[in-house]
């Protein structure tokens, strides 16, 4: 996955033998692939960032049993995603070289019904304060979800916590470019 060969973006997902770590096959998907998530039905959701010109960001679905693309979701732009049960939380930060601007969107896609449940999972207007979403995670125990904001990539970012219904519970300033979140059930020591 990745977009390191502009304009000749790679467009394949590699299937790896975990015993030998060798590529068994490649699956042709779409250009500039970025992230993958597996649902409970054996489908792999793959984000494509497009080419920032005429090919827009979208989501592809691979059936892990057949290693075939079974769905292309052009109306679901996708930079980053997280899955919890049947809900695929997706945000997109789409850059356009035509307009020299970002288009940011948020959605929840239902992996069971194959329908978009909502076009904005943040319901209290907080999304207007988030400049560049850069990470997302869902607490599997509580359903709370977290979105990070990289802001301008050179100043401290922000971590937002939202309730299941999309309302901001709290936020905290982070280091630069916050991207990843981990959950644990072990009690951690407080930083002094």
Model regions and ranges:
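Predominantly soluble domains enriched in secretory-pathway, periplasmic, or organellar proteins
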Residues: 1-192
């Amino acid at each position: 996955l990745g977009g390191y060969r502009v304009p000749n973006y790679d467009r394949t997902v590699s299937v790896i033998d975990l015993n030998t770590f060798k590529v068994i096959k490649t699956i042709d998907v779409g250009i500039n692939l970025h992230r993958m998530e597996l649902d409970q039905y054996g489908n792999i959701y793959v984000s494509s960032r497009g080419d920032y010109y005429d090919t827009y960001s979208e989501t592809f679905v691979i059936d892990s049993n057949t290693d075939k693309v079974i769905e292309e979701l052009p109306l679901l732009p996708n930079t980053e995603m997280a899955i919890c049960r049947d809900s695929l939380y997706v945000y997109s930060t789409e850059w356009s070289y035509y307009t020299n601007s970002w288009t940011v969107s948020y959605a929840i896609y239902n992996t069971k019904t194959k329908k978009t449940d909502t076009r904005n999972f943040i319901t209290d207007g907080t999304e207007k304060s988030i400049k560049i979403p850069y990470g997302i995670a869902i607490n599997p125990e509580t359903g709370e979800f977290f979105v990070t904001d990289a802001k301008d990539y050179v100043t401290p970012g922000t971590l937002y916590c939202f309730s299941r219904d999309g309302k901001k519970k709290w936020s905290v300033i982070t280091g630069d470019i916050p991207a990843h979140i981990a959950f644990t059930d072990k009690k951690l020591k407080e930083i002094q």
